Amino acid sequence: SFDQLPFAFMDIEMVFDEEKRAVDWIFRYGNPELARLEKLPLDRLIGNSFGSLFSNMDSKWLRSYERAVLYGEKLELIDYSPEIDANLKVTCFPTFPGHCGCILFNISEIEFVNSR
């Protein structure tokens, strides 16, 4: 089950405008690590749009998730998320029609091992 994974996972449904451009997404599934990362309980996330929860939504996430949904691309992003004040590594990929799955890591929490 995704609930036991040690990293954040979500399945989102993209919301498009008339020109087929992504304008938001709705959280359809999230595991407990996602709630910790987003700093919101799952019952506030699931069924709600990202834009309704985070007024400072950065469109860079939309463009990447849009590509995964519309073109079936698997993408990896490493960028700062002003919404939750964290540096993230995100892997997104198509799941169901209109949806994409995302694996998220807060890279500031990752301990890197140096080989000597």
How would you name each of these model-derived features?
Residues 15-18, 79-86, 88-96, 103:
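PAS-family sensory domains
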Residues 17-22, 34-45:
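PAS/PAS-like sensory domain cap-loop motif
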